[in-house]
Design a protein with these regions (language model features):
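Anionic ligand-binding catalytic core segments
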Residues: 1-119
Length: 119
């Protein structure tokens, strides 16, 4: 979710948009994703920057930030980069998804311009 929020510019990525579920045995799991949508306005009070940080940063992310996160949470080496590539591959398909959903071409193009698919 973090990678998607950064690449697709969901800058409304605050803690109330991440939840957990507990099953009948008391085991916890991450809830299905929700409120994950494009929300970027460079002059907006809440959407001008990410609400959550990655490697102490809220903008100008690099692949090194994802690698640092991978290490910090003891993720299998290289898995963070795999996730990042999967997310970037999915987000580059945005124009096709937007067209299928009937998003006006001008709007879809404006959103495409600010996606971070080159990290």
């Amino acid at each position: 979710r973090m990678a998607f929020n950064i690449v697709a510019r969901n800058q409304d990525d605050h803690v109330k948009n991440i939840a957990f579920l507990m099953d009948k045995t008391g085991s916890w799991s991450l809830s299905p994703a929700f409120d994950m949508t494009y929300s970027y306005n460079p002059t907006g009070r809440w959407t001008g920057t990410h609400q959550m940080s990655l490697n102490g940063k809220r903008d100008d992310f690099t692949i090194d930030d994802f690698t640092a996160c991978e290490k910090a949470i003891a993720m299998q080496r290289g898995r963070g980069l795999e996730i990042m590539q999967e997310v970037q591959d999915a987000v580059t398909q945005w124009p096709a998804f937007a067209a299928e959903a009937g998003v006006p071409a001008e709007t879809a193009d404006q959103i495409t311009l600010v996606h971070r698919t080159g990290i």
